[in-house]
Amino acid sequence: MAVIQALLAFYGLVAKTPLMHYKLAAMAMMRLGSKGSLADLAVNAYGGWLYYVAPDRVWLQETLANHSILSLLSQDWPSLVIQPMFAPTDLEVLVGWTGVPASTDNLIDQWQDRSGTAYQSFLSSAKETVQAIKEAFETGDSLAIQSRLADYRHLLLQIEKHNTLSIETPALRELVTIAQAYQFEAKSSGAGGGDCGIAVGQGQGLKKELATAWQAAGITLVELEIGAPQRPSEEAGN
């Protein structure tokens, strides 16, 4: 996103909305062959908590090949949803880094090559779980957010077992186990297979203790502050 902003500044251009920033970055990543959801770009553009549904990749690839960037900036992107959310005031979030990088593209290739019906079933269940998390945000239910995060983790473990993949590495499993000991729920973040895990809990109670326990296990606490989301002046949707 910083590269996009630097290029805009260099050419004296302005992206007036977070959605425009997202679209520019998403088009660049698609041209580079990225297979991820592009959700990280939405978070960079908007900030804060988001409910995100990825755009129709087939449509985006075909349209990007046959239309100008300006044309895509002005169009609605099918399936794309970027909705700012506000977290319950008692929701606590920690992110831990296991010290091992991971590749989203490589993992997606393995899933699509091996999964078939199981992969599609996972996608359907994951969509339902994410929708439940969204509803928990809307009602301010921190405990439901924790519970649904745990559900999503179990979906990942099922698809991991079905495909003999390495989504939850031993280090990530330890991250989760430690989090649960301090009344948090946790799961791998992003592609899995290494990298980071995210933990959510309720209230300030054991947050510091969890951070200390992670660090004792060789898990690096990622310092972060989740700001208020920007309110878009145009809607992202279909």
What residue spans do the PLM features occupy?
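Glycine-rich nucleotide-binding loop
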Residues: 192-194
